[in-house]
Amino acid sequence: RETGVEISSFIVVYRWSGPTEEQRKMAVENWKKMIEIAVDMNVPVINTEFSGDPNQQEICNGMWFRSMEELLPIIEKEGLRVEVQSHPYDFCELNNEACDLVKSFRSPNLGYVYSSPHGFFYDEGKGDVRSMLKYAGDELTHVLFADTFNQTLDCRYIANPPWLNQRGKSDVTIHQHLAMGEGDVDFDGIFE
């Protein structure tokens, strides 16, 4: 404060979607402390992710709602805005479903972040940024810019060893953040 420098936002990632109740409760306590810190430091925005486990979507979805029901009244009371993005390997990776989760609370204190390097996860490899941003509508509060390759196309990324998961299936997500223009993201569509 003495220097005049202000912080525009924090970014935190807690396991508020579980998949275990112990993880969720611990995350909610961490969230409460982070909210206190944001208020004390006059930081109006906290960016975050859904977290959870894509292999336990139903459980994690319920845990996220339980966490939000506990935290959103505090967030609203303190006048903060929480902006949520879907991240690869979260319980919810799809754009429209993520937007629906945010929209379901009908709160101006809860917004949706579109992260362009995650866009191919958001619509299962189509990369149709125009329709995703249109669907987000008024809940869209923030866009993160970086390029990436479409991970669904053949030979874009190689993950070794092939047995990365003992359950006998691929349980790995791969993406990267590149400079704009170095990958497959439709930036013209974003800027329209």
Feature-to-residue mapping (PLM):
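Acidic/histidine-rich catalytic cores of soluble enzymes
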Residues: 10, 69-179, 184
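Active-site acidic/histidine proton-transfer and metal-coordination neighborhood
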Residues: 3-9, 15-114, 121
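Short amphipathic alpha-helices and their capping/turn segments at secondary-structure boundaries
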Residues: 1-3, 31-40, 99-100, 127-141, ...
